[in-house]
């Protein structure tokens, strides 16, 4: 029987909502980098999704340095898990930030005054280059990321390990990791908390940075009028480089969170997740930081609820139906504002 005609279950609705918000927050984390760059230089950086993918492969490589694999991570000591995650949290954002700035300096900087189609096509080209680097780095098949978070939950949360009778039962193992207790019909794990615990503070910090710091005010000046900003003594190239660095770092944080929660990496993942992130940025109002988060949450809910009640086949199409409907009534997105351009 199709999911649409299944008996309605309020607990299932709640669980799908929780899962949708988790995925939406993850999409929002990637979308923040998209909207940050577009808000300053009006460039749709289609390579952003594949930059996120390379960050995932670097996180996988960091696990390899410490000998962590899917088969051995359960026996790893807590200190090794903590050091691995800590090193990934530092190295991956730095790597993505440096790579993003390098691409800007080598590719986008020379196209600042070119027609807008030129940097757009160049971004698509960079995306294909990154995708092939990912293919060379990790191969053509999906690679399982070590379940570092699950292995550490027994230590951090104090949950009892599954008994021998239930050790092979994934359902029973999941129940032991539920923060609401093993008998709760709703499941909230540390994966859910991790995604929100990273996305929401980063959104708040980014908003405060743009609105209240000197560099943030310089970014807004460059976004409004680059020529006038230069006349006021603002180093626009430096501001744009900082913007790309922040956007890349956000992609890197998204990479770490994604690998810890999804546990699967492949070279094509950047395109799909990048498309979701771009859609979230447009849906919320591209260039608007809270809008990117709101757009990501909407996409996560539509995807999760659509998969549960309509069918996974149609969930992707439903996301873009929602996007079209919202843009028909609000062309600037949910939180976007109308801006008049003088000629």
Please provide the spans of the model-predicted regions.
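Cytosolic-side transmembrane-helix boundaries in multi-pass membrane proteins
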Residues: 2, 11-12, 224-231, 235-238, ...
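Transmembrane helix-bundle core of multi-pass membrane transporters
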Residues: 3, 111, 119-211, 305, ...
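Single transmembrane alpha-helix segments in multi-pass membrane proteins
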Residues: 13-64, 102-118, 281-289
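Inter-helical junctions in multi-pass inner-membrane proteins, predominant
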Residues: 8-26, 209-214, 240-287, 304-317
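Membrane-interfacial amphipathic/re-entrant helices at transmembrane-helix boundaries
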Residues: 1-30, 58, 69-86, 114-118, ...
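Membrane-embedded helix boundary and interhelical linker motif in transport proteins
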Residues: 5, 40-102, 106, 165-172, ...
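Helix-loop-helix "hairpin" substructures at the membrane interface of multi-pass membrane proteins
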Residues: 187-265, 289-294
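Alpha-helical transmembrane segments within multi-pass membrane transporters and channels
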Residues: 71-126, 133, 294-299, 330-331
């Amino acid at each position: 029987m199709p999911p649409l005609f299944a008996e309605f279950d309020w607990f299932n609705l709640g669980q799908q909502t929780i899962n949708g918000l988790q995925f939406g927050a993850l999409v929002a984390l990637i979308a923040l980098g998209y909207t940050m760059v577009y808000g300053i230089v009006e460039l749709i950086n289609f390579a952003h999704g594949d930059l996120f993918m390379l960050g995932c492969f670097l996180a996988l490589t960091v696990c390899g340095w410490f000998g962590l694999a899917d088969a051995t991570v359960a026996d790893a000591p807590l200190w090794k898990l903590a050091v691995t995650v800590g090193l990934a949290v530092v190295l991956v954002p730095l790597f993505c930030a440096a790579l993003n700035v390098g691409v800007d300096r080598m590719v986008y900087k020379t196209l600042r005054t070119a027609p807008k189609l030129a940097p757009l096509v160049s971004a698509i080209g960079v995306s294909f280059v990154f995708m092939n680097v990912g293919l060379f780095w990790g191969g053509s098949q999906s690679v399982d990321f070590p379940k570092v978070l699950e292995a550490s939950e027994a230590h951090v949360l104090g949950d009892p390990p599954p008994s021998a009778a239930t050790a092979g039962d994934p359902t029973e193992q999941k129940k032991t990791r539920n923060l609401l207790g093993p008998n709760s019909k709703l499941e909230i794990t540390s994966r859910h908390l991790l995604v929100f615990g990273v996305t929401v503070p980063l959104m708040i910090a980014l908003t405060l940075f743009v609105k209240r710091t000197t560099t943030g005010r310089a970014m807004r000046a460059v976004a409004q009028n680059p020529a006038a900003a230069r006349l006021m003594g603002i180093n626009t190239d430096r501001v744009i480089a900082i913007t790309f660095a922040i956007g890349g770092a956000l992609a890197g944080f998204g990479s770490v969170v994604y690998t810890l929660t999804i546990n699967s990496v492949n070279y094509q993942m950047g395109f799909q997740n990048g498309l979701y992130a771009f859609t979230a940025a447009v849906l919320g109002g591209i260039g608007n930081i809270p809008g990117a988060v709101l757009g990501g949450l909407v996409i996560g809910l539509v995807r999760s609820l659509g998969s549960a009640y309509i069918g996974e086949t149609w969930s992707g199409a439903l996301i873009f139906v929602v996007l079209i409907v919202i843009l028909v009534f609000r062309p600037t997105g949910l939180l976007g504002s109308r801006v008049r351009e003088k000629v």
